[in-house]
Amino acid sequence: MAKKVDMAVSQSKESAKSLNQSKSRASIQRMFDEVAPTYDFLNHLLSLGIDNYWRAKATSRAKKLLEKNPAPRILDVATGTGDLADSMAKISGAKVTALDLSPEMLAIARKKYPQITFLEGYAEKLPFKDASFDIVSAGFGVRNFEDLGKGMREFHRVLKPGGYAFIIEPMIPRNEVMKKLYLIYFKNVLPKIAGLFSKSSFAYDYLPHSVEKFPQTTAFTAILKKSGFKTADFFPMTFETSILYIAQK
């Protein structure tokens, strides 16, 4: 029995590595459709509730940049169940549109936040005209894009001149002690806890692989600048376990 469990775990990890390498849009969609019922619960549990703080931090910075804008238009991409979109919607006068490729995640988002417009779609082909938004945000979703460069160019395209991209992603700490502790939790503890509550433990094997492969700090700001943004900065949060990128068109 133990051998069968070990084999299943090994197969799940290999599949996760394979998905991280291919980033098939259809596979990513299926994965998020599967985890949708337990997504919010596990997000808050596995981050110890700190994910809400990260969203609030991003929204606070966005609010300051939009002080002179009485009716900002905001697009939240890879919105999932809509938590970052809802946070951004608390900015005075903001009109928020949110987009995701998972129908199951969107069904939950619409029930939670009926005041927000939710659309099905994907980052590499945003269904909006040029210069439509003051802010484009994405919380914990950019590393799942099938084509990261194309997605960032689309962010740039739909932003108004002077507009901002706000992107939150997990970060692997640069401090060696924190890095070791983080990776032990991420690779060994997190998938096991997730497996107790989610039908798709595969998704939580994929998570650490996707974070490790994602270009971090200056590597990602270089991609943002290459995509047309005139400035791109990063702000590590909570002992460098998460990072906020802000880029201006």
Regions found by a protein language model. Give the residues of each.
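Conserved alpha-helix/loop element of class I SAM-dependent methyltransferases that forms part
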Residues: 48-71
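Hydrophobic beta-strand segment of the Class I
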Residues: 39, 136-137
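A short glycine-rich, Lys/Arg-flanked "PGG" loop and its adjoining helix->strand segment in the class I
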Residues: 149-161
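Core SAM-dependent methyltransferase catalytic element
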Residues: 221, 227-249
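N-terminal auxiliary segments of SAM/dcSAM-dependent transferases
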Residues: 2-30
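C-terminal alpha-helical "lid/dimerization" subdomain adjacent to the S-adenosyl-L-methionine
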Residues: 26-27, 101, 168-223, 227, ...
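A short acidic, Gly/Pro-enriched loop at the edge of an enzyme's catalytic core
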Residues: 124-135
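Class I SAM-dependent methyltransferase SAM/SAH-binding core
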Residues: 73-126
